[in-house]
Amino acid sequence: MNGAESLIRAAVGAGVDVCFANPGTTEMPLVAALDSVEGMRAVLALFEGVCTGAADGYARMTGKPAMTLLHLGPGLANGLANLHNARRANSPIVNVIGDQATWHRAADAPLTSDIVSLASPMSGWVRETKSPGALAGDMADAIAASLTPPGKVATLIVPSDCQWDPAGDAAKPRAVPPRAKVAGGTVDNIAKVLRAKQPTTILLGGHALSLAGLKSAARVAAISGCKLMTETFTARIERGAGIPNPMRLPYFPEQALEALKGTQKLILAGAKSPVAFFGYQGLPSSLVPEGCAVET
């Protein structure tokens, strides 16, 4: 078994079974492994941004990571815009980026670049494989990193000689820490805020926009009389007949400020404190009304 096969086996063993790929010469051993190792479905895309965008959408809808396979630094660069979106949405993605053979890097061939520097701004985890024997373990670590709450983009850089050289057995899946629970004291504090009957808005985001989250928020609003709103742009929100459909916070700051006008307590449930998307003349960065207390 070579390094490429050990990587794909590690991925399949950890439950990653879809790869959105736009490969080149430095990824050919991995392309062969996609064919020889059962359990991984390869989807060819003709542009790297399609690979990263598809992986982002897949993660948002399934809650599990897909693998991307991209060609060197320029190929990664072509997919960075959608990795930015994925990072903002906390989407679990595992990028596998082929690189020059370790002994060929010094030649400074035309497509050689600093892949770590390109990957780092859009990734929550970056590693460069150093040997064929480390490849399976590195892949298992990348998958676990991508799934670590709240989810992140993990990028693994794989030199071509580490792919084609012999490797050891596939690595076992790593343990992934569970999502942290809200402390009991925080729940008690929010309950006190709601019982105070001051003008209160709950701003929903993240997992609060699941079916269970929306229904729970609607029950809280019905009992307390608070207003429900969602972030302007959500990673995912459940929709359908009978599902609560809170108002979205408007995009433009004037409208957002008007929507939150009069709110004295703003409770953030999976959401960030709202800010304007750009700096506008004469308007604030923060959309929290003046004098409003933010509770988390």
Q: What name fits each language-model region?
A:
Residues 1-296:
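N-terminal alpha/beta PP-like core and its mobile active-site loop of ThDP/TPP-dependent enzymes
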